[in-house]
Amino acid sequence: MSLLTEVETYVLSIIPSGPLKAEIAQKLEDVFAGKNADLEALMEWLKTRPILSPLTKGILGFVFTLTVPSERGLQRRRFVQNALNGNGDPNNMDRAVKLYKKLKREITFHGAKEVALSYSTGALASCMGLIYNRMGTVTTEVAFGLVCATCEQIADSQHRSHRQMATITNPLIRHENRMVLASTTAKAMEQMAGSSEQAAEAMEVANQARQMVQAMRTIGTHPNSSAGLRDNLLENLQAYQKRMGVQMQRFK
């Protein structure tokens, strides 16, 4: 795997699924291919994106700044600086300085990533902030190692919380989670339907699922009533795709 492919993989792993993720993936591809040279426009676009956490925006802003050539005098952006200040915790800043000194001695992406993984997310963010604010310099490879270590830690904590959701036994939470997943799947079906001849059929299935979820939420139902709702929806989607001649590998 090439360095930029690895960076793209790690960065995208912390972004929630949806149309925005696809848009960000395209921006990263363009930036890494040298097709987008307007850093200021890119940062303005990033600043106004909804859904993303400040830290995620900070990491993306850091990656864009590392990759897109810019004039030396270009101002640093406040929204990135605020996101990469380690929550203003002096302990994070102390650890970030120690980490920075170690990173100065590293020359490879993997070496930097290994060193960085032993630090907390707050310290890693603060260290990115040091480099972003030009208070310290490391090679681009080492900076990318720092980025990927940070993303790995964030993705780990997200994965733990997803696992907890999967093992949760509270029927009310499981019921709501199934309905949320059904709504999300319905939305994906509508987006995939596009303008094909059978699109109306897919839209109809998705619409019915939405209405069912809405009705369940409005009148209140037994927590078991949503069991199988998302699976039924996925079966409908797979049947629709087979007729379209599209083989769906994995959609769960």
Curated annotation (Swiss-Prot):
Motif placement: Nuclear localization signal: 101-105
Region (RNP-binding): 165-252
Pfam family, one: Flu_M1
Name this protein carries in UniProt: Matrix protein 1
Positions of the UniProt region annotated as Membrane-binding: 1-164
Coiled-coil stretches: none
Subunit structure, interactors included: Homodimer and homomultimer. Interacts with NEP. Binds ribonucleocapsid by both interacting with genomic RNA and NP protein. May interact with HA and NA. Cannot bind NP without genomic RNA.
Recorded family membership: Belongs to the influenza viruses Matrix protein M1 family.
